[in-house]
Amino acid sequence: MSHLLIVEDDIAFGTMLQTWLRKKGFEVDKATSVGAAVKILSSSGSVDLVLSDLRLPDHDGLQLLSWMRKNDIYAPFIVMTNYAEVQNAVLAMKSGAADYIAKPVQPDILLQKINDATEGYAKSKNSNNATTDRKSKGGNAAANSRTANAKAADLESSTRQT
């Protein structure tokens, strides 16, 4: 069972996501701010995926992503953003986010993105079990960053065409 962390300041939406994802078989923690997310990540040891809003009351989701990477937490990071914030999603992808999803969230698309990201992360964790040095972790982060940058370029291209 994958362990997810939802970071969403809209309490009703975050609770709905948490309930729905638990019904889909995920273990789910929820935070309403970057500070609360940092506490969860610091105390839980690890998660398999972070699903975060970009705009949060204390900081933004990109600052959480940066904190995670500085603290050697390489779990996939999916950004949730409003349609009007597509350029912020591009920036998130360039910063190392695994993916993004526009609000309002379509459940089937969200579930597919979560499954894709957690399956990829599980495979990379298994391959890293043999080699746990920092250099290996950095290699995976670099590979994830290249994938995210390709998605960001596709996103930028599609926004220019519309």
Mark where each language-model region is:
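Conserved acidic carboxylate
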Residues: 8
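Active-site residues of response regulator receiver
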Residues: 53, 81
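Two-component/phosphorelay signaling modules centered on CheY-like receiver
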Residues: 11-29, 117
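C-terminal output helix
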Residues: 85-87, 105-114
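Short amphipathic alpha-helix used as the core "switch/output" element in two-component signaling
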Residues: 62-73
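Acidic, metal-coordinating helix/loop segments flanking the phosphotransfer/catalytic sites
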Residues: 30-49
